[in-house]
Amino acid sequence: MHNQEEWLDKDKTLVNEEENTCINHSYTKKDTNNYRVGKSGIKDLKKPTNQKEIAIKNRELTKQLTLLRQENNHLQQACKILSENKIIENRKSIEKWRTICEMELSFILNSTLIKINRMGGYKDFLEKEMEAKKRRLEYQIDNGMEDQICEIKESDDFRQLSEVEKQEWESQMNEQLKELEKKKIAELEKLNKVLHDSEGKDFGMAELCTRLKLDYSLIFPQ
């Protein structure tokens, strides 16, 4: 019996030692893993950060945020305008504005037609106007360029040039005169086309708006 108890104690001791060995081994392994994770985290903390890249990224994000805030404000204002009361108010304001514009333009048109009739009618008025534009165009291109050439030739700088340089300059001026002559002819053709297209037409509200640089369709919607 005594020997049996010793055997049991011995066996029990063997079991406990085996369990303790497993527990100690597991604990040691866990501690090792924990140590490795902590070591990796320390390495990550020690990685150098590029402050310049962070600053650039911060500026870009700040700019995007500002634009988004502006867009949000615009959308909020649009929502307010699109509310039912605002739409009605805006329509009333538009109609009032159109009524005032129509009245003012009608007065200007009547006054202009009286002057045109005194000049012999719309055709005579337009011919005189086109002739005045042609004379102004010819003076600006021909006389203006000739005056500039004369001033340059009489200057001290031009006199100091060699004969070769003077010839080169005159050649360049002749080319410029040819280009200006082409432009003058093109502009004169446009003026002649205006006269041709006006045949059988009268001075009306649409032409008045064009001359006043107003959008006819805004005041007189179809």
Swiss-Prot record:
Pfam families for the chain: Mei5
Oligomeric form and interacting partners: Forms a ternary complex with DMC1 and SAE3.
Cellular location(s): Nucleus
Entry keywords, A to Z: DNA damage, DNA repair, Meiosis, Nucleus, Sporulation
Annotated family: Belongs to the SFR1/MEI5 family.
Predominant localisation class: nucleus
GO BP terms: meiotic DNA recombinase assembly; reciprocal meiotic recombination; sporulation resulting in formation of a cellular spore
Function: Involved in meiotic DNA-break repair. Required for the recruitment of DCM1 to meiosis recombination hot spots.
Gene Ontology cellular component terms for the protein in this record: condensed nuclear chromosome; nuclear chromosome; nucleus; Swi5-Sfr1 complex
InterPro entries to which the protein is assigned, alphabetical: SFR1/Mei5
Keyword Coiled coil included in the entry's annotation: no
UniProt-recorded name of the protein: Meiosis protein 5
Gene name tied to this protein: MEI5
